[in-house]
UniProtKB/Swiss-Prot annotation:
Molecular function as annotated in GO: nucleic acid binding
Alphabetical list of InterPro entries matching this protein: Restrct_endonuc-II-like (IPR011335), tRNA_endonuc-like_dom_sf (IPR011856), UPF0102_YraN-like (IPR003509)
Family the UniProt entry places it in: Belongs to the UPF0102 family.
Cysteines paired by S-S bonds: none
Protein name: UPF0102 protein Rru_A3692
A Pfam match: UPF0102
Domain of life: Bacteria
Amino acid sequence: MRRSRRQGERRGRWAESLCVWWLRLHGWRILARRFRSGRGTGAGEVDIIARRGRLVAFIEVKARAEAARALEAITPRQRIRITRGAEAFLGRFPLPEKGQARFDVMVIAPWAWPRHLKDAWRLGL
């Protein structure tokens, strides 16, 4: 693994950990981190799956030098793969009665608090 890739991986894990703490401080319960539905299924990894009350959020974390660039980094193809991962999670762990699911994005930029963009997109589910 190249050095720049390792640094990116380390930065991504740090950003996810920061988001987990931010979510916990705001009343969320973390159900899973880096959830994968399995190799060869076409489903991507969901960075964080969190629950507050009857709401389950599938959260993609992006760390970039500028917040706007972080949002651009989530492509339509990536959204579809994350949605498939969410469907696989819900297949194993169904929503609570009258529960809801949504897709959120958390953006990490230098010298700023994490930004939690709620209901960032809708697909399937």
